């Protein structure tokens, strides 16, 4: 989903995209003009990507080219990776967003950049929603807020957009996409499971904790 849809749409729409650390080719001049690599965030690739684009450099995302990549081999490695990416993205947002909003890029680019760099803030809300599920069950069973719960049930439709996002990305790259999309509930459960880990990363990033 990230590569097939997000990166493709951002690139074609003129929005800022991020280099993912691997599978890319940089011009040496671009890196030097952007101020070289910085070590003040955990996601130096995201940081450099934005600094380069703010001074006029542009990336070209080649969707039809593939490159080998390694995935975490066990759950602790995955949690460490997600923690690093989440905390680093928050650190980068604190560092880069003031520069984005002071720049002369179009308003739509500023808004999209804000959504992009702050999207990990959703994890504390996912965690909060999970915690509140238990008391909500008892409140609902009391029968005193039927209208409220009837209206709130409409928000379940929000999951439809996530499902379509991943369904179309899998359909585009895999002939047997139906076999993969049935794992979507497992993916959502995994995202919920990472909420504690990633929420801690968000707060550490916000508090500039090293």
What spans do the regions from the language model cover?
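Catalytic donor-sugar/metal-binding loop of nucleotide-sugar-dependent glycosyltransferases
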Residues: 40, 49-68
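Membrane-embedded multi-pass helical conduit in multi-pass membrane proteins
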Residues: 119-209
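Nucleotide-sugar-dependent glycosyltransferase catalytic core
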Residues: 70-87, 178-181, 210
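Flexible glycine/proline-rich, aromatic-decorated loop/lid segments
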Residues: 1-6, 28, 47, 54-58, ...
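Conserved glycosyltransferase catalytic-site signature
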Residues: 42-47, 186
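Conserved helix-loop functional segments at active or binding sites
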Residues: 28, 40, 65, 99, ...
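Flexible loop/turn segments at secondary-structure boundaries
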Residues: 17-18, 68-70, 135-138
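Long helical/loop segments within the catalytic core of UDP-sugar-dependent glycosyltransferases
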Residues: 1-42, 75-107, 111-114, 118
């Amino acid at each position: 989903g990230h590569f097939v849809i997000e990166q493709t749409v951002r690139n074609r729409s003129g929005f800022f995209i991020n280099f993912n650390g691997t599978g890319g080719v940089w011009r040496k001049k671009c890196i030097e003009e952007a101020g070289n690599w910085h070590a003040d965030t955990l996601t130096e690739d995201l940081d450099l990507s934005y600094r380069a684009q703010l001074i006029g450099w542009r990336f070209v995302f080649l969707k039809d080219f593939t490159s080998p990549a390694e995935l975490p081999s066990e759950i602790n490695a995955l949690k460490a990776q997600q923690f690093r990416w989440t905390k680093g993205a928050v650190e980068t947002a604190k560092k880069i967003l003031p520069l984005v909003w002071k720049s002369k890029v179009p308003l739509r680019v500023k808004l999209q950049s804000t959504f992009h760099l702050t999207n990990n803030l959703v994890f504390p809300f996912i965690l909060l929603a999970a915690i509140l599920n238990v008391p909500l069950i008892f409140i609902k069973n009391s029968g005193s807020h039927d209208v409220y719960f009837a209206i709130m049930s409409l928000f379940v439709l929000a999951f439809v957009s996530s499902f379509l996002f991943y369904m179309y990305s899998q359909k585009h790259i895999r002939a047997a996409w139906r076999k993969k999309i049935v794992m979507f509930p497992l993916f959502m459960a995994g995202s919920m499971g990472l909420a504690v880990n990633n929420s801690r990363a968000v707060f550490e990033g916000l508090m500039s904790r090293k």
